[in-house]
Every structure is written in C-alpha cells, then in structure tokens.
Amino acid sequence: MIPMLYHNVLPEAEEYVKSVEAGKFEDIQTESGMFKKIQQRGEDALYSLVSHFMPEYEIVMNFVRKSPLGQKEPNFIHTDEMHGDKTLIYYLNQTYPEGYGTTIYDNNDIPILIHRAQFNSLFMFDSGYKHSRNIEENFGEGEDARMVQVMFLKAKSNE
C-alpha cells in the first residue's frame, strides 16, 4: 500500500479535540510494551468514519496519545506490525513545531518519506513500515503537548 494522506477529515474537528482533552489519559501495558498517556477512544467519530470508508478492515485499537516535551518513549524508529495491517495517525494539535510529522524509513533506517503534520489530517500506511515521529523528544506541555490519535486495522478474513 502506498501511504495515503487525507486533509479536513472531521467536519467539527475543534469540538472533537475538546472532547478528547476533557477525557482521562493513563499509561496502559500492551503486549508490545507500555503505552504512555493514552486515552482509549472506542467507537468515536473517527472510528465511524474509518469503518465506513474501510469496511474490509476491523479497527483493533483506537486511542489518543498525549506526549509532552521530554516524555521518554520505548521506541523511536519502529513498526506496528504486531498490532495490525494498517496504521492510521490523526493529527490533533492546532499548531506544530517546524518539521513535525511522521517519517517512513527503508530497511536501513534511511528516511524515504517525510510527512509534515497538519491539524485534522490523517496519515495511513502499512503497519510493517518502519516509521517515527519527526521530533524524538516530543513537544509542548499541557494542552499544547503533542497529541495524535492512532488506529490499528486488521484485514477481515474472506471466509
């Protein structure tokens, strides 16, 4: 799959972000390690949209991650293949530091695609692709901390 980018994803994105910010963020242990400061989202507006446009996939994880400046993460360059077939990243911050976004790498960890984040945009790619956020140390504090919604999708079987 060629990575895909969508802009203006949700019609009322500002209200959506307010609902996210009103929720609780917590650390959750998963089979691949500790997910810090996440909020599980369940069947929210983005879930409904993705389910409608990608009915051949099941959404197996749907969460928002808040990552303030200096928050240590277990991995920088990594894959998500243990979680699903597709990774979706929805950008929730109104503004970003220069150059922030997501980078996809080749097998030698050489950047081959650099995406610059924009509010209310969604970046989708195969979960087996090596990738990272563009700023390793994260950014912001409080309401200005890095905030992305992540979904992992698995292809439904044709049985």
Regions found by a protein language model. Give the residues of each.
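Catalytic core of non-heme Fe(II) oxygenases with the double-stranded beta-helix
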Residues: 60, 67-159
